[in-house]
Amino acid sequence: MTDASVKETFSFQTEVGQLLDIVAGSLYSNREIFLRELVSNASDACDKLRYEALTNPSLAQNADEFAISLAVDKKAKTLSVSDNGIGMNHGDLLDTLGTIARSGTGAFLDALKSEEKGDIGLIGQFGVGFYSAFMVAERVDVLTRKAGEDESWLWSSDGKGEFSIEPGERAQSGTTVTLHLKKDAKEFLEESRIRHIIKTYSEHISFPVRLDTEALNSASAIWTRAPKEITEEQHTEFYHHVSNAFDKPWHVLHNRVEGTVNHTSLLYVPSMAPFDLYEAERKSHVKLYVNRVFISDNTRDLIPAYLRFLRGVVDSQDLSLNVSREMLQSDPKLAKIKTSVTKKVLSELKKKAKKSPEDYAGFWQNFGPVLKEGLIEDPALRDRILEICRFSSTKSGDVTSLADYISRCKEGQDAIYYIAGDDARKIAQSPHLEGFRAKDVEVLLLSDHVDEFWLQHITEFEGKPFKSITRGAADLDKINEGEKADDAEEEAQAPDLNDLIAALKLELGASVKDVRPSKRLTDSPVCLIADEGDIDVNLERMLKRHGQLQDAMPRVLELNPDHRIITKLAERAKGSAAASDTLLKDAAHLLLDQARIADGETPADPAEFVRRLGSVMDSAL
C-alpha cells in the first residue's frame, strides 16, 4: 500500500539525460510538436474512458462532454493541458511516466485488440511523446485522478533524472499537465501561436480542444463518417482545408479497409494542377494520421511519387511509430497501406475513365505526365497504370487508350507506332508521319519528357511492340495486303536512285550513317531517322541536352523517290560531270540541313547553309 500522505521520489528507469538528448536533437527538432503530443495523450485518455464506460456505466458521468482544455498563465509562465478522461492512479504514474519503453495506453490497446473490438479507436504512444514537454519546460507537473477512484496524485519532475509522486487534489477524473516554461519558450504563452499549432496538428481530434471557452478545432474527423453522410459542400470545404487550394475536387475517393491493417483514406483529385507538381522534391501532400492525430504531410512511404497530385488523409490505428512520431519505423504495415491505397486509386481512375471519357481527358491533361512516372517506378503495378494512360494520336483531337488504339489497328499491323518529341504541335507535322497518314495508320504522338524513359522499360502492350517511326524501317509494306499490287506498280515506276545515293554518300561522308530510299515519305523530299538498334532521335536529343551524351550518332538520310527535287537530282547524278557538280554538292548539304530543320534542329553550319541556299537559288533564276 502507498502512504497517501508521503511524497515519494523515484529515479527514471531509463536515463533521462540520454532520452532528452534524443528529444532535443534530430527527432524533436521542431519544438512545437510537444503540444501535439500532450493533446494527443489527452485525446487517448478521453477515448479510453469512453470505452471503459461502455462496460462500467458508473464511469459514464463525463461520457457526453469529453473535452481538452488549454490554459495560459503569463504571470506564472505556465501552459496547461487538461482532460476529463480516464486519469491515472499511483501505479499508472509509475508505469507510464516512470518507464520510457512502456506505455499504459499501448498495453490497453493490445488488450483491446485481443478482445476483437477493433471499432474502438485508441492510439498507444502515451509516456513516450510526453517527454517532449521537457524541450520547452524546466519543470512539468501532472495532476491526475483515475475514473472510479477517490485519490488524486501529483507527479512532478525537472527532467534531470528523478521524479516525485505525492497526493494531490482534483475534483473529478482526468489529468492536467502543467508546463513551467523555459525562458526561450515564451512564444508558447501567446494565444495566436497556440491556435496555429492546434490548427496544424490537432484539427481533427474528435474531442473539442478549447482555449478558455474558444474551441480551436473542428472536433470532427470527417473521414470517420459514412460516405453517404458527407455532402458535396463538406467535401469541398475539407478539401480546401487539407490542400490550401481553392478549386473544387475533381474526384473524391473515400475508402475504409478492415483486415490485416485497418485504415481509412479520404483522398481528393484536384481539378487544377498544383503549382508545385513538378518540383524536384516530388513531395506527397496526403496527411498521415494515427487515430485522428496528425503525424506527417510528407510521408514518402505512404503515397507513391507518381500520385503526388492527391490531397487528403490516410488514418490508421494499427501503425507503430518511433519515439519522436516524426519518423515512421520501417513498418511493413505502412507498405501494405501504401499498396492498398495505390491500387484503390488506380481502380477508381479506371472506372472514371470508362464512365466519363471526356471528363477523364481533362484529368489526363493535368496529371498524365506525373502518372506516367509510375510506369518507370512501380513495376508491380505497371500494367494497371498503362491501362489508364491516355495518348494523343493522329486519328483525332481526342486522347486514346492503348486498348482502343489496338482495336483500330490495320490488317497486317503488328506494332504500336509512335513518334516522340518536345512539342506536340511540331511532331504532329513531322514528315515521318506522311506514309502512315497515307495508309491511314494511327500513330501515337508522345510529347511528355517522361515518355522516352518509360518506353525503355515497357516494350509491348497486349502482344504488340512499341515502335518509333523515326527509327529503323517503316514496315508499311505488310499493312493492308490488298494495296500491294499498287505498291509494286509504284516501285516499278520509281526512278533509279543508285547514282544519287552514291553521290550524296560521297559528299556527306561521316555526316550520315547511310542514304536510302524512303517508304515513309509522300510529300517531303527527305527525313532523318535513327538506324535500327541506335538511340531514337528524340531520346538522343534529350540526353545531349542534359549532358549525358557528348557526340550525336550519325543518322540515316531517307529520300522520297517520288519528290520532284529528288527525281531531278537523280537525273543530274547520272551525268558524267556529277563528281564535280557544285550544285549537286550544295544540294546534298541543303537536303541534310532541311531534314534537320524539320526535326526542330538547326543546320550544322548556319553560314554555309545560307551560302549554299543563295547559290542554288541563283542557279535556278
Curated annotation (Swiss-Prot):
Entry's Gene Ontology molecular function annotations: ATP binding; ATP hydrolysis activity; ATP-dependent protein folding chaperone; unfolded protein binding
Membrane-spanning ranges: none
Region described as A: 1-325
Segments for region (C): 542-621
Keywords recorded for this protein, A-Z: ATP-binding, Chaperone, Cytoplasm, Nucleotide-binding, Stress response
Chief location: cytoplasm
Any single Gene Ontology cellular-component annotation: cytoplasm
Keyword Lipoprotein attributed: no
Region (B) residue spans: 326-541
Superkingdom of origin: Bacteria
Compartment list: Cytoplasm
Membership in a protein family: Belongs to the heat shock protein 90 family.
HAMAP family: HSP90
Record's function text: Molecular chaperone. Has ATPase activity.
Subunit text: Homodimer.
Protein name stated in the entry: Chaperone protein HtpG
Organism: Roseobacter denitrificans (strain ATCC 33942 / OCh 114) (Erythrobacter sp. (strain OCh 114))
